[in-house]
């Protein structure tokens, strides 16, 4: 199972990848970085993306409900299926990923589920012209699943 550096290197092989990082959304610190930063500083990017991730992870608006596909109820969607048809794990993050589209690119934030109480996500910055958003989401999901933390 690969560690942080290997996973970020793999993320950078995606078409259009400009930068990647693993960020702790409670502290806003980058745990690892690769490639470029949209603002020229990975720590600033980490702090700014952490604010967005924290909002999505903590606001009740984004919690799974009985009305969600799969009708499982409760935060984490225990027993339901994700957008890829695979079963969701009980207690997992209520938000799988966030996508922000800008004129020049895409920012994909993928929450990482761990065996301990973590609050980390992968951030991938893609060029809008050469990046493939669907492929990036699928590959980030796979990278997040095999990432070893701790």
Model-derived regions: residue spans:
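Non-catalytic interaction/Regulatory regions outside core domains
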Residues: 1-150
